[in-house]
């Protein structure tokens, strides 16, 4: 779904990963009227449960604050793990950096630095990376991408139960041009330890603002159903827990979905050897790849998406395909999204078979 990201925190790189990665970040507030503002601070790696009041109280202990903003997800309201504090006196801002930078709060080591003014060169520099080797560490991910520019934050998504990598990561560069170079250099390449090429793409697409309302509905709509053989009384999951594992987001509708044991041992023809191919039917004419990336991303590593378009009109013909690397994640995505109402259409989602529509 990882993912429509807006520009996030701008700080020096640290070994401590970001507190969260999300598809619908608010853009950072402007750091002031001048490029050399010495009163506005950006505060990174804040504890996930820290409130704006607590942020204000912490920094207010240093000096008088003009404004304070904890940046939250536009859809869920969840903290994105960073914020901005603007002091009245530049000396207080300097003191806050000297006092609070490196402070250990819960499991996080916060980073406090001067904020930069917002500009086109530093916006939209977030990358979504899929197909990573499960053994790759966050440090190795940064080493792979650091040759293209300064990395602001990085993260590899892991299963919170097993701690095993989900094969998906995010890299936020200092500048968009650096992210563009990383895409040119690494997309479709095999990093050390990988058996398949990785996919590197922008995690955000500013032109897809019209999709946010639809995707918000996907996250929050209580109108869900789970037809077909998946609806067995097997191990039960909660959709909000699933997405919490993927992105740390908890404010999803508490719909239950049934487990995958009913699919165990079944020989499904949707596996071509390079991933599990999923057929998505009844898409709207204006549907594009962005919708599919953002719908399926939180369930696991997505290596490819394709919307089938009419040759003459370039409009979606009503169906598309998604390829995921892991069977369990693909099956969970099908269980969650089959029968989902997207806009005024009910989606049909299944493993691709020999009888499935052809491109």
Curated annotation (Swiss-Prot):
One of its GO terms (biological process) is regulation of synapse assembly. The gene is Elavl2. RNA-binding protein that binds to the 3' untranslated region (3'UTR) of target mRNAs. Seems to recognize a GAAA motif. Can bind to its own 3'UTR, the FOS 3'UTR and the ID 3'UTR. PANTHER family: EUKARYOTIC TRANSLATION INITIATION FACTOR 3 SUBUNIT G. This is ELAV-like protein 2. Belongs to the RRM elav family. InterPro entries: ELAD_HU_SF, HuB_RRM2, HuB_RRM3, Hud_Sxl_RNA, Nucleotide-bd_a/b_plait_sf, RBD_domain_sf, RRM_dom. Pfam families: RRM_1.
